[in-house]
Amino acid sequence: MALASGTKKVKAVNKIVGAGSKWVALAKKIVFLEGLCGVESANYGPSEILCIADSSTSPDIIASSMIAQSEHSPDVMSICITKDRKLINKIRRSIKDQLQDLPRNRIARKSLNNYGIIIYAKDDKKIISISDSIGPEHVEVLSKNYKRYLSGNLVAG
C-alpha cells in the first residue's frame, strides 16, 4: 500500500507486479480498484520450493526448508532432489520429527502429504534436468559443492 500511495521518502509507483500470497493479491486488487496504481493481470497459483541437496547438508536443514514453505498453504509443493539414497530416509525422519513440534503442523502436514516429494536422481546432470523440468518458484542448493549446480542455468522464479 505504501508503494502505491507513496511515503515521505518514496515516490508512489506507477505499477506493482510480481507474485505473492493471497494477501499480496488482495492488496494489489485494492490499490488497483482505488485507482492508486496499476497491477499486472496475472493470477498466481500456489508456490513451490525445490531443494537440491546432498549429504554435506544436515537432513534437519533440508527438512526445515521443505516444511517452512509448506506451512504457508496446503497446496504448496515441497520437493527435494538428491543423489544420496541414505539421505532420503534421514530427511523423511526429520520432517516427521519437526512436524510434531510445529504450531501450524496441520497445514504443513497436509501440504507435504499431498505435494511433498523427495526424488532420487542418479547424477548431477539428472538433478538439474529434473529441476529445470519442474521450473519451481524457489530453488535452494543445499550443498557444500553448490557451484557444480550453478554452472548451468537453473530454471526458477
Regions inferred by a protein language model and the residue ranges of each:
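Hydrophobic side chains in well-ordered alpha-helices
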Residues: A27, I62, I91, I130, ...
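C-terminal core of ALDH-fold dehydrogenases
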Residues: D124, S133-G157
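Short active-site oxyanion
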Residues: A12-K15, V76-S78, Y115-I117, P136-V139
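A conserved active-site cap/scaffold subdomain adjacent to cofactor or substrate pockets
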Residues: A42-N114, I118
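Conserved NAD(P)+-binding/catalytic subdomain of aldehyde/semialdehyde dehydrogenases
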Residues: M1-M77
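Short hydrophobic/aromatic-enriched beta-strand-loop microsegments
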Residues: C37-A42, L99-P103, H138, A156-G157
